[in-house]
Amino acid sequence: MLGQSIRRFTTSVVRRSHYEEGPGKNLPFSVENKWRLLAMMTVYFGSGFAAPFFIVRHQLLKK
């Protein structure tokens, strides 16, 4: 009995909560400013691409 009432309460709380809906609202970053998004994506993908080269350079220069 207690478990059912707790389950009903938690599901009703979830149903009553409201989040913004629409394209880009469910992402962990903003897509409103396209230039900021471009810079963030360049840094993100660029760092992933450049990391192996810097690691190899570090290993070659190490004595």
From Swiss-Prot:
Q: Which CDD domains match?
A: Cyt_c_Oxidase_VIIc (cd00929)
Return the transit peptide range from the UniProt record.
Answer: 1-16
**Regions of this protein lying in the Mitochondrial matrix compartment:** 17-34
Keywords from the named record = Acetylation, Membrane, Mitochondrion, Mitochondrion inner membrane, Transit peptide, Transmembrane, Transmembrane helix
Residues bearing N6-succinyllysine are K25
Indicate where the modification N6-acetyllysine is found in the sequence: K25
Q: In which pathway does it act?
A: Energy metabolism; oxidative phosphorylation
Task: State where the protein is found.
Answer: Mitochondrion inner membrane
In terms of SUPFAM superfamilies, this protein maps to: Mitochondrial cytochrome c oxidase subunit VIIc (aka VIIIa) (SSF81427)
The reply on keyword Transit peptide is yes
Q: Do you know which Gene3D superfamilies this protein is assigned to?
A: Cytochrome c oxidase subunit VIIc
Q: Which Pfam families match?
A: COX7C
Instruction: Tell me what topology the record assigns in the membrane.
Output: Single-pass membrane protein
Q: Name one GO biological process term.
A: mitochondrial electron transport, cytochrome c to oxygen
Similarity-based family: Belongs to the cytochrome c oxidase VIIc family.
What is the protein's given name?
A: Cytochrome c oxidase subunit 7C, mitochondrial
Q: Which organism is it from?
A: Mus musculus (Mouse)
